[in-house]
């Protein structure tokens, strides 16, 4: 349990999240308009999106399927009967004068997700609901000193709003939840999770209380656009509330905006209640009825999800839970790993993947899909180390060449003459030379100066150009020096 340290004692965080995830779909929720990002302003707007009189919405079946699959991934109940409602409010970039959402009967309810805590335990976060709704357009106030401009390309794009219960007890837990949810959505293929492009946005409902006391008054922080800012926004807002309460003031229930530059939240508007939006069923849309057959079909076609992969990697490949989580955190990395793991030692592969490959990818600022080393060639490199064809040190040189050129490791080893020397007779000859050339060091070692052993190993490696099998060198040197 994390606490906020106030002047009068400790306070608890109470946090609930609302995640707006843009549905991966080529067309919008109720029209056939394209959803391509960064298109020319107002180039992807149908008469439905612009709310022209007489234009009726037509539900996108693919968006419904994406919501069902996401609900299944969240271990939630898929409601066979759900209804679209009109949420009435006025924004200039909302042409209809209302948003089509689901208030009374959402498509998904009562899910769960487990997240790791600071103690290493797993904590269950309850998902209250997932509902479908349409996005608004975008208002631009910096294009002219006299006018505001409206871009309706985003208007009508399908969103899944995923709402948690107030089960989150620290900024770090909130960040873990969003990271894990984003990864799940990417595996399912229902949202790309790109927070920079706005295809995943996070609102945080935050209150504070003394341990054991009732819930306090909450404030909602809108449109937090990165994992780092989730932590910053929650920390600032919780401290702001603690300072107010400790000075004898009350918390006003309101909606606030987080400023990433200043690291502060500011008042946006007083918090609305459901009554303010005058929800009522949309008369232009029939209730959504979902069959058991459809649910079962979508469930059968779900990909292997992150938690399932972690369990498989720890059981089948004997990886540590930590290593499994690191690999599974990126679907492309997990796919790469699985292709290579079928051809070599998975544990050794993991070590090289998470150290050498990740290091080079970060240095080059590229993703694993852009890497020139194929999974098969990576597996070949691991096998060359495993069967003592090359040493770990030589393997690093080979790996660097592979990363630059994409060449197969066996060809590089052959071209460069890098095969490890593992012949006892050859190594014994070299060791005899080293011992003969360094009588004083031999005498020193035999008189108890054990640290000199590293000197002898270094001399053997020098004479063999670094190609000597280090395990054999250690073994043979010990035998020679102790005789």
Curated annotation (Swiss-Prot):
What keywords were assigned to this record? ATP-binding, Ligase, Nucleotide-binding, Protein biosynthesis
Against InterPro entries, the record matches this protein to: Asn/Gln-tRNA_amidoTrfase_suB/E, Asn/Gln-tRNA_Trfase_suB/E_cat, Asn/Gln_amidotransferase, Asn/Gln_tRNA_amidoTrase-B-like, GatB, GatB_C_1, GatB_Yqey_C_2, Gln-tRNA_amidoTrfase_suB_CS
Entry superkingdom: Bacteria
What EC number(s) does this enzyme carry? 6.3.5.-
List the molecular function annotations (GO) for this entry.
asparaginyl-tRNA synthase (glutamine-hydrolyzing) activity; ATP binding; glutaminyl-tRNA synthase (glutamine-hydrolyzing) activity
Q: Which SUPFAM superfamilies match?
A: GatB/YqeY motif, Glutamine synthetase/guanido kinase
HAMAP family given in the database record: GatB
Which family does the record claim for this protein? Belongs to the GatB/GatE family. GatB subfamily.
| Quaternary context | Heterotrimer of A, B and C subunits.
The name this protein carries in UniProt is Aspartyl/glutamyl-tRNA(Asn/Gln) amidotransferase subunit B
The organism that produces this protein has a lineage beginning with:
Bacteria, Pseudomonadati, Pseudomonadota, Alphaproteobacteria, Rickettsiales
Chain's gene name: gatB
